[in-house]
């Protein structure tokens, strides 16, 4: 079953593990945490939009209302209802690249709903992570050629544990 649908699972792995995680961690080097959180909170809007464009799921008024209320709630919580914080936000390189990461995750989420899976949730997760990891390998070699080196120490393994485990949950 996996081999019959490998292209589908490969796209899921690339859009989630490879692109989304890489871009989000890269973007957070250049933007403020508040900007990142606000931008990531718009992912449900993007999922609905992409699902609608790809004709995966029809959007109804209640979904739009729910996402709108959710987004407003997130903005109010993060800014502590001080809208001056929003006015003073400056968009930078990190914000712009973060948008591509969010679009990648929204695409992954929409495509995940497209197909009825015959795999258990754990197997699906393993397959998606495996494909995503395979496509991270070339990125590693590119970074290595540029001069970035991984130091195999305790800090590296703690970061690796966090990056591998938590985003996929």
Predicted regions and their residues:
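Specific transmembrane alpha-helical segments of multi-pass solute transporters/efflux pumps
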Residues: 1-35, 39-40, 76, 164-169
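Juxtamembrane helix-entry segments on the extracytoplasmic side of multipass membrane proteins
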Residues: 2-6, 79-104, 141-162
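Residues that define the loop-to-transmembrane-helix transition and helix capping
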Residues: 7, 34, 60, 122-123
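Residue-level signature of transmembrane alpha-helical cores of multipass secondary-active transporters
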Residues: 9-13, 25, 37, 67, ...
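Membrane-helix boundary and inter-helical linker elements of multi-pass secondary transporters
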Residues: 29, 55-57, 117
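Alpha-helical transmembrane segments of compact multi-pass small-molecule transporters, enriched
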Residues: 39-53, 68-69, 131-135, 158, ...
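Transmembrane alpha-helical segments that form core, pore/gating elements
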Residues: 47-49, 53, 85-144
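Hydrophobic transmembrane alpha-helices of multi-pass small-molecule transport proteins
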Residues: 59-81, 136
């Amino acid at each position: 079953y996996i081999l019959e649908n490998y292209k589908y699972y490969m796209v899921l792995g690339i859009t989630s593990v490879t692109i989304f995680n890489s871009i989000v961690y890269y973007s957070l080097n250049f933007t403020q945490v508040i900007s990142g959180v606000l931008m990531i909170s718009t992912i449900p809007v993007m999922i609905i939009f992409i699902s609608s464009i790809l004709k995966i799921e029809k959007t109804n008024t209640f979904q739009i209302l729910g996402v709108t209320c959710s987004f407003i709630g997130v903005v109010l919580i993060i800014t502590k209802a001080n809208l001056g914080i929003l006015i003073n936000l400056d968009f930078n390189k990190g914000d712009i690249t973060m948008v591509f990461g969010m679009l990648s995750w929204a695409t992954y989420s929409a495509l995940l709903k497209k197909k009825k899976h015959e795999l258990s949730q754990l197997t699906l997760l393993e397959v998606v992570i495996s494909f995503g990891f395979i496509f991270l390998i070339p990125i590693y070699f590119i970074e290595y050629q540029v001069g970035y080196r991984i130091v195999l120490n305790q800090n590296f393994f703690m970061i690796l544990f966090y990056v591998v485990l938590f985003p996929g949950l």
